[in-house]
Regions:
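Conserved glycine-rich cofactor-binding loop
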Residues: 10-14
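Conserved glycine-rich Rossmann-like NAD(P)H-binding loop of the short-chain dehydrogenase/reductase
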Residues: 26-43
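The beta1-alpha1 cofactor-binding region of Rossmann-like NAD(H)/NADP(H)-dependent oxidoreductases
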Residues: 55-66
């Protein structure tokens, strides 16, 4: 069975971070995006199911690029949660 994948923007702090940890602890692949790469790295270093993808959501072309990177890594995205 393939693991489910969720992409969470605003995943480095607050609700986004809490949600990322919750899904990761349930065995999901969790792609998190935020502007602060250092926070993304801290979170992904703490949980093997969390992967950071730096992103400024105001850049539409970068949003598309990051979404494609996530799809390429996990083959699918089951849920997108925009917590920005």
């Amino acid at each position: 069975m393939n693991k489910k994948t969720i992409w969470i923007t605003g995943g480095s702090t607050g609700i986004g971070k809490a949600l990322a940890i919750k899904f990761a602890n349930k065995g999901w692949n969790v792609a998190i995006s935020a502007r602060r790469e250092n926070l993304l790295k801290e979170i992904s270093d703490e949980n093997e199911n969390i992967y950071g993808f730096p992103l400024d959501v105001t850049d539409k072309s970068k949003c598309k690029e990051v979404f494609e990177q996530i799809k390429n890594k996990f083959q699918n995205v089951d849920i997108c949660f925009f917590s920005t």
